[in-house]
UniProtKB/Swiss-Prot annotation:
This is Small ribosomal subunit protein uS2. Pfam families: Ribosomal_S2. Belongs to the universal ribosomal protein uS2 family. It comes from Thermoplasma volcanium (strain ATCC 51530 / DSM 4299 / JCM 9571 / NBRC 15438 / GSS1). GO terms for biological process: translation. GO terms for cellular component: small ribosomal subunit. InterPro entries: Ribosomal_uS2, Ribosomal_uS2_arc, Ribosomal_uS2_euk/arc, Ribosomal_uS2_flav_dom_sf. The gene is rps2.
Length: 199
């Protein structure tokens, strides 16, 4: 039985969620839909959709303050900050200071139980520390990402302004629905534009 699409397939595509990279890692092979004539790998949005549903269920089981979401990429700053505001999660955008998760004597130390990374490549310091302390890792992974140590892969264009807004908007909505904070999607009063980085 096919899972319900959180938004129409065309909406994922219009937002560029399916646009991968011209380099593919073997780890991401299961999430590739096709390769375009120009060599660009296209991601399977049905798998993106399915993984968002799974991530929403998983994250809803954690207390909000136990969820950390990180982003080094500038286009992800606003989506991540808005996601944190809407869900109550903790966010770090920009530089991830070494020791944030591993050194309790630091003033910026964070004690969390799960992490969401926007790009395993860009957010490598956060990844290393999450692995070291053994907390689950959810990662937005593009066609070129390695997925070692990632517990839940969300295959998506993790570089595009609109695609990042859509992914974090959907993930926030799914968490609130699974928590019972909202009982229907109509009650989610935020728009994708609220999550999108400004140019």
């Amino acid at each position: 039985m096919e899972e319900e699409m959180l938004i129409p397939e065309e909406e994922y595509q219009k937002s560029g969620v399916h646009i991968g990279t011209q380099v593919k890692s073997s780890d991401m092979k299961p999430y590739i839909f096709k390769i375009r004539n120009d060599g660009l790998y296209i991601l399977d949005v049905k798998k993106t959709n399915s993984k968002l549903i799974a991530a929403g269920k998983m994250l809803a089981r954690f207390d909000p303050q136990d969820i950390l979401v990180v982003a080094q990429r500038q286009y992800a700053f606003r989506p991540v900050a808005k996601f944190a505001e809407v869900t109550g999660a903790v966010s770090i955008t920009g530089r991830f200071n070494p020791g944030t998760l591993t050194n309790p004597s630091l003033k910026f130390y964070k004690e969390v139980k799960v992490i969401v990374v926007t790009d395993p490549l860009a957010d490598v310091q956060a990844m290393k520390e999450a692995i070291k302390i053994g907390i689950p890792i959810i990662a937005l992974c593009d066609a070129n990402n390695k997925t070692d140590f990632v517990d839940l892969v969300i295959p998506t264009n993790n570089k595009g302004r609109r695609s990042l807004a859509v992914i974090y908007w959907l993930l926030a909505r799914e968490i609130l629905k699974n928590r019972g904070t909202i009982t229907s999607y109509d009650q989610f009063k935020y728009t994708i534009d609220d999550f999108e980085a400004q140019i």
